[in-house]
Swiss-Prot record:
F(1)F(0) ATP synthase produces ATP from ADP in the presence of a proton or sodium gradient. F-type ATPases consist of two structural domains, F(1) containing the extramembraneous catalytic core and F(0) containing the membrane proton channel, linked together by a central stalk and a peripheral stalk. During catalysis, ATP synthesis in the catalytic domain of F(1) is coupled via a rotary mechanism of the central stalk subunits to proton translocation. GO terms for cellular component: plasma membrane; proton-transporting ATP synthase complex. NCBIfam families: PRK05759.1-3. GO terms for molecular function: proton-transporting ATP synthase activity, rotational mechanism; proton-transporting ATPase activity, rotational mechanism. This is ATP synthase subunit b. It is a single-pass membrane protein. It is found in: Cell membrane. It comes from the Bacteria. Keywords: ATP synthesis, Cell membrane, CF(0), Hydrogen ion transport, Ion transport, Membrane, Transmembrane, Transmembrane helix, Transport. InterPro entries: ATP_synth_B-like_membr_sf, ATP_synth_b/b'su_bac/chlpt, ATP_synthase_B_chain. CDD domains: ATP-synt_Fo_b.
């Protein structure tokens, strides 16, 4: 700051001196003192800006560039991870579908086996019941046939007596033959 103040006072002094010399004729090809003073001020301002202003700006720009580079790299990595995860997901989904299909087919086959077993049991049970019923009917038929065979003689005698009107149980009639 002190340098700028001293430079500014030097510039005003040179400007005052040039104003006093204003009466003299100046050649525009020969530089006067103001040119060198303005050049010195320009170089000082340039040095101050280069020293105090440009490095922080460059630092911020570098940090932002690094941040953008890191973000782009992170995005690229995330895209690769997403692609890999999606491929894994599709593979696992295909495996799960295959497993589900296998389980479903196995369950259907097991169901068919159980159904066939139940049919065989029902058929065997029906056959057993039919055979038991047939045996029972045959037994009852034999019993009934035996009862009828024993009762046929007495029934036929009773019927003949009623039709003929004669008693066949008498001993005289029994001798006739």
């Amino acid at each position: 700051m002190g340098e700028l103040h001293s430079v500014a006072s030097a510039v005003t002094a040179v400007a005052a001196e040039a104003a006093e010399e204003g009466g003299k004729q100046n050649n525009f090809l020969i530089p006067n003192g103001t040119f060198f003073v303005v050049l010195a001020i320009f170089l000082i301002v340039l040095a101050v800006i280069g020293t105090f202003v440009v490095p922080p700006i460059q630092k911020v720009l570098k940090a932002r560039e690094d941040m953008v580079t890191k973000t782009a790299e992170d995005n690229r990595n995330a895209a690769e991870q997403f692609t890999a995860a999606e491929a894994d997901y599709k593979d696992e989904l295909a495996k799960a579908r295959g497993a589900a299909t296998a389980v479903r087919d196995e369950a259907r086959a097991e169901g068919r086996g159980i159904l066939e077993d139940m049919r065989q049991r029902a058929n065997a049970e029906a056959t057993a019941v039919t055979e038991t019923a047939a045996a029972e009917l045959a037994r009852q038929g034999e019993v009934t046939a035996g009862e009828l065979a024993t009762n046929v003689d007495s029934l036929s005698r009773t019927l003949a007596e009623r039709v003929l009107g004669v008693s066949l149980s008498e001993p005289a009639n029994a001798g006739r033959g």
